[in-house]
Amino acid sequence: MATMKDVARLAGVSTSTVSHVINKDRFVSEAITAKVEAAIKELNYAPSALARSLKLNQTHTIGMLITASTNPFYSELVRGVERSCFERGYSLVLCNTEGDEQRMNRNLETLMQKRVDGLLLLCTETHQPSREIMQRYPTVPTVMMDWAPFDGDSDLIQDNSLLGGDLATQYLIDKGHTRIACITGPLDKTPARLRLEGYRAAMKRAGLNIPDGYEVTGDFEFNGGFDAMRQLLSHPLRPQAVFTGNDAMAVGVYQALYQAELQVPQDIAVIGYDDIELASFMTPPLTTIHQPKDELGELAIDVLIHRITQPTLQQQRLQLTPILMERGSA
């Protein structure tokens, strides 16, 4: 593999001149530039990104660590993050933990060793990154998305899940439903707990009772919604409406109702959360709470880059406002 010294020798110039031509950081005459470029082409020379990053102490790379999920929300969020990285001249290294704490910490260590300029974390309270690893790299800026695992200087960006759960439930109440069930996500996740609290707050405000068995814990996945809805259908007092903690579980709810030969919303109204792309293509289109995923991804990258360039800034906690998307399921 050719080196910068090989290019300099062939072009008859110094290595610093080759560096200036490659980096375009100082004037070099057209004649010498042409010689260097010809040598680069002849030797098939590729500049070392590693050497450049060591020299500048910057890799223009951002690491992202997420828990495993087939939930389309995560793929849409990652897409927004990746697009925002590209638009700002950064590369994204994505690591999926698949719920394995050992794998998560190994991935975290790898990202840190690769000298990422910053880190995005989207995990859960029960699967936290190693405090010891994080403390070993105190200068790496970090943005937490949806939750903050431990005290520190990390910035936090989250959806107002409490308000979103309230909005969804109040919409069902305003539609005249009184027997409203809730399928929550895993209660080790702060958004799941807050959406449940929002549901309870709206029910209490309306003076509506929540029968035993009307709150079922799912897993934010398709199967979780399916199993939870089947459980609700076996309840002696079948609910008139269901608030599902995310759209992926709402897909499972639809399937359970289809197999039970029940129609949405004629027999049971359904409202979701996240507003994934699939929501508007379901039959009927899913009424849901919109999370601004592109805005969330863009904001996360902007906050992280701001932290990279100004590391002494005070910690930021930003909250995005959910919006009701009224369609045909409730």
Swiss-Prot record:
Q: Which cysteines are joined by disulfide bonds?
A: none
InterPro entries found in the cross-reference section:
HTH_LacI (IPR000843), LacI/GalR-like_sensor (IPR046335), Lambda_DNA-bd_dom_sf (IPR010982), Peripla_BP_I (IPR028082)
Q: Which PROSITE patterns match?
A: HTH_LACI_1 (PS00356), HTH_LACI_2 (PS50932)
Annotated region of DNA binding: 4-23
Specify the superkingdom.
Answer: Bacteria
| Swiss-Prot/TrEMBL keywords | DNA-binding, Repressor, Transcription, Transcription regulation
Coiled coil where?
none
Tagged with keyword Iron:
no
Can you name one GO molecular function term for this protein?
A: transcription cis-regulatory region binding
Q: What role does this protein play? A: Transcriptional repressor for the ribose rbsDACBK operon. RbsR binds to a region of perfect dyad symmetry spanning the rbs operon transcriptional start site. The affinity for the rbs operator is reduced by addition of ribose, consistent with ribose being the inducer of the operon.
What's the protein called, per UniProt?
Answer: Ribose operon repressor
